[in-house]
Amino acid sequence: MIPRAGSNGLAQRRAIIPFRKVNARGTAHYDPGLQRHHLLPRQLLSTECFSKMFEHLGRRPVGFDDFRSNGLLLPATEAATQRLGLPMHRGPHRRYNEVVIERVGRIESRWAEARTKTEDEAGIEALMRLRLLQTALRRRLLDERKRLILNRKDPLGAGFDFTELDAMAEA
Protein backbone atom coordinates (compact mmCIF):
# COMPACT_ATOMS: atom_id res chain seq x y z
CA MET A 1 0.00 0.00 0.00
CA ILE A 2 1.22 3.50 -0.71
CA PRO A 3 1.70 6.00 2.12
CA ARG A 4 -1.52 7.79 3.08
CA ALA A 5 -2.36 11.40 3.88
CA GLY A 6 0.31 13.26 5.81
CA SER A 7 3.14 10.80 5.24
CA ASN A 8 4.61 12.02 1.95
CA GLY A 9 4.91 15.14 -0.16
CA LEU A 10 2.05 14.09 -2.43
CA ALA A 11 -0.44 13.54 0.36
CA GLN A 12 -3.19 16.03 1.07
CA ARG A 13 -2.19 18.64 3.63
CA ARG A 14 -5.50 20.44 4.07
CA ALA A 15 -9.02 19.37 4.87
CA ILE A 16 -10.97 18.51 1.76
CA ILE A 17 -13.72 20.73 0.41
CA PRO A 18 -16.56 18.41 -0.68
CA PHE A 19 -18.10 19.21 -4.06
CA ARG A 20 -21.55 19.41 -2.48
CA LYS A 21 -20.40 22.37 -0.33
CA VAL A 22 -19.36 24.49 -3.33
CA ASN A 23 -21.97 26.70 -5.00
CA ALA A 24 -24.74 24.85 -3.15
CA ARG A 25 -28.36 25.89 -3.63
CA GLY A 26 -29.75 27.78 -0.68
CA THR A 27 -26.40 29.22 0.41
CA ALA A 28 -25.55 32.92 0.42
CA HIS A 29 -23.01 32.66 -2.40
CA TYR A 30 -24.97 30.33 -4.72
CA ASP A 31 -24.77 31.39 -8.37
CA PRO A 32 -27.16 29.47 -10.66
CA GLY A 33 -25.02 30.52 -13.64
CA LEU A 34 -22.13 28.33 -12.43
CA GLN A 35 -21.70 24.56 -12.22
CA ARG A 36 -19.13 22.36 -10.51
CA HIS A 37 -16.79 20.58 -12.91
CA HIS A 38 -14.69 17.52 -12.03
CA LEU A 39 -11.24 17.83 -13.60
CA LEU A 40 -10.86 14.05 -13.34
CA PRO A 41 -14.40 12.88 -14.14
CA ARG A 42 -16.18 10.51 -11.76
CA GLN A 43 -16.61 8.21 -14.76
CA LEU A 44 -13.01 7.10 -14.14
CA LEU A 45 -14.07 5.39 -10.91
CA SER A 46 -16.57 3.18 -12.74
CA THR A 47 -14.23 2.34 -15.62
CA GLU A 48 -13.20 -1.27 -15.03
CA CYS A 49 -9.70 -1.00 -16.46
CA PHE A 50 -8.75 1.58 -13.80
CA SER A 51 -10.29 -0.20 -10.80
CA LYS A 52 -7.07 -1.85 -9.56
CA MET A 53 -5.08 1.38 -9.72
CA PHE A 54 -7.72 3.50 -7.97
CA GLU A 55 -8.32 0.79 -5.38
CA HIS A 56 -4.58 0.83 -4.66
CA LEU A 57 -4.22 4.62 -4.66
CA GLY A 58 -7.48 5.44 -2.88
CA ARG A 59 -10.04 8.16 -3.63
CA ARG A 60 -8.73 10.65 -1.07
CA PRO A 61 -5.08 10.81 -2.20
CA VAL A 62 -6.22 11.28 -5.81
CA GLY A 63 -8.60 14.00 -4.61
CA PHE A 64 -11.69 12.82 -6.50
CA ASP A 65 -14.05 14.22 -3.87
CA ASP A 66 -12.03 17.36 -3.04
CA PHE A 67 -13.15 20.44 -4.93
CA ARG A 68 -9.83 22.15 -4.20
CA SER A 69 -7.88 19.34 -5.92
CA ASN A 70 -10.31 18.16 -8.55
CA GLY A 71 -12.88 20.89 -9.07
CA LEU A 72 -13.51 24.10 -10.92
CA LEU A 73 -16.59 26.33 -11.15
CA LEU A 74 -17.52 26.91 -14.77
CA PRO A 75 -20.31 28.92 -16.37
CA ALA A 76 -23.51 27.06 -17.19
CA THR A 77 -25.25 29.78 -19.18
CA GLU A 78 -24.32 31.74 -22.27
CA ALA A 79 -24.43 34.99 -20.26
CA ALA A 80 -22.04 33.62 -17.62
CA THR A 81 -19.78 32.23 -20.35
CA GLN A 82 -19.58 35.64 -22.02
CA ARG A 83 -19.01 37.37 -18.66
CA LEU A 84 -16.26 35.02 -17.43
CA GLY A 85 -14.68 33.96 -20.72
CA LEU A 86 -14.50 30.35 -19.54
CA PRO A 87 -15.75 27.18 -21.24
CA MET A 88 -19.47 26.55 -20.83
CA HIS A 89 -20.29 23.57 -18.61
CA ARG A 90 -23.80 22.49 -19.48
CA GLY A 91 -24.73 18.93 -20.20
CA PRO A 92 -22.32 16.08 -20.86
CA HIS A 93 -18.83 16.70 -22.15
CA ARG A 94 -18.04 13.35 -23.74
CA ARG A 95 -15.00 14.45 -25.73
CA TYR A 96 -13.35 15.96 -22.63
CA ASN A 97 -14.00 12.73 -20.70
CA GLU A 98 -12.60 10.64 -23.57
CA VAL A 99 -9.40 12.68 -23.63
CA VAL A 100 -8.98 12.49 -19.85
CA ILE A 101 -9.66 8.74 -19.87
CA GLU A 102 -6.99 8.33 -22.55
CA ARG A 103 -4.46 10.28 -20.43
CA VAL A 104 -5.33 8.32 -17.29
CA GLY A 105 -4.97 5.14 -19.36
CA ARG A 106 -1.35 6.06 -20.02
CA ILE A 107 -0.79 6.68 -16.31
CA GLU A 108 -2.44 3.36 -15.42
CA SER A 109 -0.38 1.48 -17.99
CA ARG A 110 2.84 2.87 -16.56
CA TRP A 111 1.63 2.14 -13.01
CA ALA A 112 0.72 -1.47 -13.91
CA GLU A 113 4.16 -2.06 -15.40
CA ALA A 114 6.10 -0.32 -12.61
CA ARG A 115 4.22 -1.98 -9.74
CA THR A 116 5.66 -5.37 -10.67
CA LYS A 117 9.02 -3.99 -9.49
CA THR A 118 8.23 -1.47 -6.76
CA GLU A 119 4.56 -1.16 -5.84
CA ASP A 120 4.89 1.80 -3.45
CA GLU A 121 7.04 3.82 -5.85
CA ALA A 122 4.65 3.03 -8.69
CA GLY A 123 1.77 4.37 -6.58
CA ILE A 124 3.63 7.54 -5.67
CA GLU A 125 4.51 8.14 -9.32
CA ALA A 126 0.91 7.52 -10.43
CA LEU A 127 -0.36 10.02 -7.84
CA MET A 128 2.19 12.56 -9.03
CA ARG A 129 1.13 12.08 -12.66
CA LEU A 130 -2.57 12.32 -11.79
CA ARG A 131 -1.91 15.58 -9.92
CA LEU A 132 0.04 16.91 -12.89
CA LEU A 133 -2.87 16.00 -15.14
CA GLN A 134 -5.32 17.80 -12.82
CA THR A 135 -3.09 20.88 -12.86
CA ALA A 136 -2.76 20.77 -16.65
CA LEU A 137 -6.52 20.40 -17.10
CA ARG A 138 -7.22 23.31 -14.73
CA ARG A 139 -4.70 25.53 -16.52
CA ARG A 140 -6.08 24.63 -19.90
CA LEU A 141 -9.68 25.30 -18.89
CA LEU A 142 -8.68 28.69 -17.48
CA ASP A 143 -6.45 29.70 -20.42
CA GLU A 144 -8.33 32.25 -22.50
CA ARG A 145 -5.86 31.99 -25.38
CA LYS A 146 -6.15 28.23 -25.92
CA ARG A 147 -9.59 27.35 -24.63
CA LEU A 148 -10.99 23.88 -24.30
CA ILE A 149 -14.57 23.61 -25.42
CA LEU A 150 -16.76 21.36 -23.27
CA ASN A 151 -20.10 22.07 -24.88
CA ARG A 152 -20.92 22.32 -28.58
CA LYS A 153 -23.22 25.27 -27.81
CA ASP A 154 -20.43 27.25 -26.16
CA PRO A 155 -20.76 30.81 -27.49
CA LEU A 156 -17.01 31.45 -27.32
CA GLY A 157 -15.84 29.01 -29.99
CA ALA A 158 -15.33 25.41 -30.91
CA GLY A 159 -12.64 22.85 -31.51
CA PHE A 160 -10.20 20.75 -29.56
CA ASP A 161 -6.45 21.12 -29.51
CA PHE A 162 -4.95 18.94 -26.81
CA THR A 163 -1.33 19.21 -28.00
CA GLU A 164 -0.17 21.29 -25.05
CA LEU A 165 -2.12 19.14 -22.60
CA ASP A 166 -0.48 16.03 -24.06
CA ALA A 167 2.97 17.52 -23.53
CA MET A 168 2.20 18.49 -19.92
CA ALA A 169 0.79 15.07 -19.07
CA GLU A 170 3.75 13.27 -20.64
CA ALA A 171 6.39 15.40 -18.88
Features from the language model and the residues they span:
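Betabetaalpha-Me/HNH-type nuclease active-site subdomain
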Residues: 1-83, 156-169
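C-terminal, well-folded lobe of enzymatic/effector domains
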Residues: 79-171
